[in-house]
Amino acid sequence: MRKPELAAAIAEKADLTKEQANRVLNALLDEITGALNRKDSVTLVGFGTFLQRHRGARTGKNPQTGQPVKIKASNTVAFKPGKALRDAVN
């Protein structure tokens, strides 16, 4: 499912116009992004938690040449699914 399809599904279930649902979805994504930029986690009880994780510097390997390559430290986004979501999928 892509973003426009998700917005359409929200519009139908919440009795909103597609434009309103799209604004709601964009606001939600903006808030999650902002919280992660501030190094906060976002927990949606039953659904899961979005959090920022730090990946330390490490040595990788160039797959074409086999030579070692230094990979800089970086931050990444992680998602830990909640119990209700895990149960719904299984």
Swiss-Prot record:
Signal peptide: none annotated. GO terms for biological process: chromosome condensation. CDD domains: HU. The keyword Protease does not apply. It holds the Pfam family Bac_DNA_binding. Keywords: DNA condensation, DNA-binding. GO terms for cellular component: cytosol. GO terms for molecular function: DNA binding; structural constituent of chromatin. PANTHER family: DNA-BINDING PROTEIN HU, DNA-BINDING PROTEIN HU-BETA. Heterodimer of an alpha and a beta chain. Histone-like DNA-binding protein which is capable of wrapping DNA to stabilize it, and thus to prevent its denaturation under extreme environmental conditions. Belongs to the bacterial histone-like protein family. This is DNA-binding protein HU-alpha. It comes from Pseudomonas aeruginosa (strain ATCC 15692 / DSM 22644 / CIP 104116 / JCM 14847 / LMG 12228 / 1C / PRS 101 / PAO1). The gene is hupA.
